[in-house]
Amino acid sequence: MASPAPLVVFAYDFPHKKTYEGLLRLHLAGIPIALVIGAPFVQLHIRESAIRVAPAKLQFLSARHVCDRLGIPYVREAHNSPETVAALRELAPRVGVVLGARILSQEIIDCFSVGVINAHPGLIPENRGLDNVKWAILLGLDQGVTTHLIAGGKDVDLGRLIERQVVPVLPDDTLLDVHLRIQNTELEMMVRAVEEIGDARGKCGIEFPPFRDRGTYRACVPPEIEERLLEQFREYRDGWRSKNQREPVGEDW
């Protein structure tokens, strides 16, 4: 495979697990990065969940620190700002990737000749939006990851499909295990997607099919529904093995 064209990365300008681990994965995969755009912190006023699925109080190096050490160009700027648009138009990138971002504007997406890759922690289109691990449990959906070329406007978690992969749930899993396994799969699939379409002689975005169904976009799980999560998780975990025992999901699992 030929070397990928230099990549533009959308990241957060504060310590963030996916940003940190994603930059290291891309670097170790030998994928050149033309620019990392770190968005400043914004307070979102989202209700704090009563049931946590992610580890707490972990420390990560910031994107700026990683880029300084690896010699990667870095700028701190809001992703949808006029300054970012101007920088991207001058750079004329082929492919971008999201390692930390809010919703990107259509004007930003249009700066890329192929598109912007996102790794979503749920199976699209049936599990769009937020709290994907929890919604999958509550609705009886498979856990999984989807890589896609994002669409603009109101089509959040849609666009063009690159790959979908079901993530297994093991008999002794906790919610934290499932969450971390999904995050690990996101990074593996993100690098694979960049390698597949990042080559300047490789596939164009138009070659990837749009999603046939829009599915449903869901916000955070409401408290009155979330209170059923732990009880349903035990049933969900036991049922996953029964449903998939005849379908091998990979020797590592």
Task: State what each model feature region is.
Residues 1-253:
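One-carbon transfer enzymes
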